């Protein structure tokens, strides 16, 4: 057994920055376990967590307001290093006797910081050197307020032209404040700064690796489940697939997976899932072919939200029916990941593992009394993918573009019919195939085809045809909260259009969606 991968840990207190989860992901990349909590935690909770260091995140509030968030006083009395980032630096300064004011000159975007005094956090870290020999850092700023006076026992380490206290430090207490964001890639030395803080100043060892996570998770699953049986809804998506393989490694044939083919999957997806998990990995899988049942339930329904609810309810019904056939099952496994936990955690309650209802299978009969198994609940999506690779899942499967839970149910506009799904599957497969051939698939964040329930006249040979329209959609995004439409080459789009119209009998016109998010959403429904 490897060393306890949770022994060394960093606590990140969240003040609401859009980059806070990125801080946690960077710390994990360094190889150290960390957790992300709301800023208003209690002293008791911090003591119980026993971190090696604490990071105060940025945030949208102003420390000049009376009711703005503050770090718990215990943070500065815990005897561990503290790093304040942006708002975190400002509240650190304010709480320890410094001063913060609303700045007349806001800094958003690229800036250059000049390091004037040496300190352990920035020793030998620089991007360039000024004319008078001072180290310079290329950083990313995003702040309106600024520190105008640092606490008495702090030293000014660096400044910019408009920010006199860009970095401050109390080396004796190991307290550091930076006005910029080291967690974003625009701060070129950001990862080096975080490594220095976590590994050197906090004294953490890099124990958090994919191989160690697998070993630790399997051991904990064995301990939690014992000799019991587990049921899992396997979709073929990243989270449920990695969950299945971790459980398979821990308990083998005592895991039963239920794979429901709802008729709303991608071309040949059901066959691929069965070949992968039943064939290659020899998992115990119940394959439920339920296309007719789903399409019957959806017949005549045009409203997108009602379609989603019908699909979800029908899935739960089928899963329940299969689950009650397995009286030996004592546990329900889910692919809940850490961002789900973060979103669900109630502020200052300590209930960090309350899961949102839409992530649960839900609807199971109460008398089943199944325990919940969530092997991925500490992991970010990128960590889940790396573990999947380690477990033997193919790269192309793990790094596929996102596919919505309701599947083609939200990509066939209006009423869902088998004819529409079959046409859409074939058209979408051509689009994705051509993206791969042109080496464009990994250059866009998400690409798919939408079936439009309108007919358009077309000409084939000497005849006219009156067939359906599909829209191609491809976007580029970092976080899926906003997105730009992908500027795919015209000749590529022409090639895809020609193939779809010539090879998919029933489609006469192909259009390309050039809407950004906002105002449009990425999916059409």
From Swiss-Prot:
Q: Write down the EC number.
A: 6.3.5.2
| SS bond list | none
Instruction: Please state the pathway this protein functions in, per its UniProt record.
Output: Purine metabolism; GMP biosynthesis; GMP from XMP (L-Gln route): step 1/1
Q: Which UniProt keywords apply?
A: ATP-binding, Glutamine amidotransferase, GMP biosynthesis, Ligase, Nucleotide-binding, Purine biosynthesis
Which reaction is catalysed here? XMP + L-glutamine + ATP + H2O = GMP + L-glutamate + AMP + diphosphate + 2 H(+)
Q: Which residues form the active site?
A: 86, 181, 183
Q: Which domain of life is it from?
A: Bacteria
Q: Which GO terms describe its molecular function?
A: ATP binding; GMP synthase activity
Q: Which Pfam families match?
A: GATase (PF00117), GMP_synt_C (PF00958), NAD_synthase (PF02540)
Please state what class of enzyme this protein is.
ligase
Summarize the subunit comment: Homodimer.
Outline what the protein does. Answer: Catalyzes the synthesis of GMP from XMP.
Q: What protein name does the entry list? A: GMP synthase [glutamine-hydrolyzing]
Q: Which organism is it from?
A: Proteus mirabilis (strain HI4320)
Identify the gene encoding this protein. Answer: guaA
């Amino acid at each position: 057994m490897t060393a306890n991968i949770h022994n060394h840990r960093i606590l990140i207190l969240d003040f609401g920055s859009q980059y806070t989860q990125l801080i946690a992901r960077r710390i994990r990349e360094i190889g150290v376990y960390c957790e992300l909590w709301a800023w208003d935690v209690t002293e008791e909770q911090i003591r119980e967590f026993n971190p090696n260091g604490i990071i105060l995140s940025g945030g949208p509030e102003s420390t000049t307001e009376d009711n703005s968030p503050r770090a718990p006083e215990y943070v500065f009395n815990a005897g561990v290093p503290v790093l304040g980032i942006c708002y975190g630096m400002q509240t650190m300064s304010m709480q320890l006797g410094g001063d913060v004011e609303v700045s007349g000159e806001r800094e958003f975007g690229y800036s250059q910081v000049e390091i004037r005094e040496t300190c352990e956090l920035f020793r030998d870290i620089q991007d360039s050197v000024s004319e008078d020999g001072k180290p310079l850092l290329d950083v990313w700023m995003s702040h309106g307020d600024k520190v105008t006076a640092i606490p008495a026992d702090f030293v000014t380490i660096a400044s910019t032209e408009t920010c006199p206290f860009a970095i401050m430090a109390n080396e004796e207490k190991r307290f550091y404040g930076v006005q910029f964001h080291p967690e974003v890639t625009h701060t070129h030395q950001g990862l080096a700064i975080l490594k220095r803080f976590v590994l050197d100043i906090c004294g953490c060892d890099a124990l958090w690796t994919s191989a160690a996570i697998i070993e630790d998770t399997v051991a904990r699953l064995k301990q939690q489940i014992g000799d019991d049986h587990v049921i899992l809804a396997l979709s073929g998506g990243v989270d449920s697939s990695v969950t299945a393989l971790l459980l398979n490694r821990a308990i083998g044939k005592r895991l039963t997976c239920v794979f429901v083919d709802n008729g709303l999957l991608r071309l040949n997806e059901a066959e691929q899932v069965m070949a992968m998990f039943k064939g290659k990995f020899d998992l115990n899988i119940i394959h439920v072919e339920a296309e007719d049942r789903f399409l019957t339930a959806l017949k005549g329904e045009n409203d997108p939200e009602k379609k989603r609810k019908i699909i979800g309810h029908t899935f739960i019904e089928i899963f329940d029916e299969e689950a009650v056939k397995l009286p030996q099952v004592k546990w329900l496994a889910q692919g809940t990941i850490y961002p789900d936990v973060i979103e669900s955690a109630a502020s200052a309650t300590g209930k960090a593992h309350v899961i949102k209802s839409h992530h649960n299978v839900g609807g199971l009969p109460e008398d089943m009394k199944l325990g919940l198994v969530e092997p991925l609940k500490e992991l970010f999506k990128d960590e889940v993918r790396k573990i999947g690779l380690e477990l033997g899942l193919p790269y192309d499967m793990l790094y596929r573009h996102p596919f919505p839970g309701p599947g083609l149910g939200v990509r066939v506009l209006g009423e869902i019919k088998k004819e529409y799904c079959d046409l859409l599957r074939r058209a979408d497969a051509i689009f994705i195939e051509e993206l791969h051939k042109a080496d464009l698939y990994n250059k866009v964040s998400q690409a798919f085809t939408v079936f439009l329930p309108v007919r358009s006249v077309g000409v084939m040979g000497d005849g006219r045809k009156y067939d359906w329209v599909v829209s191609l959609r491809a976007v580029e995004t970092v976080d899926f909260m906003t997105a730009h439409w992908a500027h795919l080459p015209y000749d590529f789009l022409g090639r895809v259009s020609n193939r779809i119209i010539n090879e998919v009998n029933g489609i006469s016109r192909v259009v390309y969606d050039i809407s950004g998010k906002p105002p449009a959403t990425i999916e059409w429904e």
